[in-house]
């Protein structure tokens, strides 16, 4: 029997509902965000009643009506809005929220993406300062997309280390492609 929470990942609320109804134990919903707002017909507004009914935890992405948050300030602003609504309106425990501050490829050659990794690290640090009980997670390898495999391994390893130092609690990584850092 599985004792770890199962993460249900779908953009369709009816798929999440089917999973929640069939799985024993506690689940984590991946994900909630404000991409299409927070009204009752938004995805957020349709998913959150399911989360509340089943006592699920959530992965909260730093995406709002303007798009995917790129700067540390924007990421923290969206995360704070999500945390405040999830704990205030929906009665969730802050420890049941896993904020994904998102990271983006930094090797695109475009000036506007050069600081994306730093912005993510700074957002994690500030978020953990403001909300010590919140959990954080991150898809680490997004930062190195487009690089050759050897460069990806090095960048992913260093980036993961820096994110953990900033307060990252969990990460989505290919463990065989991470170098130990001390």
Outline where the language-model segments fall.
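Catalytic alpha/beta core domains of metabolic enzymes, predominantly
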Residues: 40-42, 46, 51-182
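Catalytic beta/alpha-barrel core
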Residues: 3-12, 27-39, 94, 112
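Alpha-helix-loop-beta-strand connector modules within alpha/beta enzyme cores
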Residues: 1-10, 14, 18-24, 117-136
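Active-site-facing alpha/beta catalytic cores
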Residues: 1, 18-26, 30-32, 40, ...
